[in-house]
Structures are given as C-alpha cells and as structure tokens.
Amino acid sequence: MPKKVLTGVVVSDKMQKTVTVLVERQFPHPLYGKVIKRSKKYLAHDPEERYKVGDVVEIIEARPISKRKRFRVLRLVEEGRLDLVEKYLVRRQNYASLSKRGGKA
C-alpha cells in the first residue's frame, strides 16, 4: 500500500524536532453536493528544525515516531504563507469565543 502524501501549512514550530501541519481537504456532500471544507492538524517530524510557521510543506506517512507523530516532512513547497496561518488563528479564536458563551452567537 502506498504511503499517504499530504500538503499543508505549518501552524506551529514550538516543539523540538516537530512541526504542526494544518491540512485542509474539500469534498462534495454525498446527498446535496455542496462542497465542504474540513481541516485536520498532523504532527510531523522535522529533525533539522528548518521549517517555520507559514511554510507550505508536503508530509509523508512514516513509522510511529512518538505517541501522536506518524508523519515526517518530505519537502518545502512554498515559503512564508503567513496569510494562511492568520486565517487559521482567527478561526480558532472565533471558536474559542463561542465556547466561552455556551455556543450562542
């Protein structure tokens, strides 16, 4: 079985030899056909610590490196896309404010 290769944005590089990569995917709703966006964060191994927040990278499936780390960074696709990181942080802040108010907008 081939290994999964995913493309995403580095949203955190605060851990040693590890980056957090946000991968977004789009798919049509099975019944209504509307295109839905879903995102997931993966921990990826970065032994040289050369990838920074905002970099667009490819990650590849690997053997388990730690409890949550199952991917390693394959290559750099694009450098410094901080606009994508800002969009993620704003969305996260909005969700946090909703949870403090009990889910009411």
UniProtKB/Swiss-Prot annotation:
Pfam families: Ribosomal_S17. GO terms for biological process: translation. The keyword Cytoplasm does not apply. Keywords: Ribonucleoprotein, Ribosomal protein, RNA-binding, rRNA-binding. One of its GO terms (cellular component) is cytosolic small ribosomal subunit. InterPro entries: NA-bd_OB-fold, Ribosomal_uS17, Ribosomal_uS17_bact/chlr, Ribosomal_uS17_CS. GO terms for molecular function: rRNA binding; structural constituent of ribosome. HAMAP family: Ribosomal_uS17_B. Belongs to the universal ribosomal protein uS17 family. One of the primary rRNA binding proteins, it binds specifically to the 5'-end of 16S ribosomal RNA. Part of the 30S ribosomal subunit. This is Small ribosomal subunit protein uS17. It comes from Thermus aquaticus.
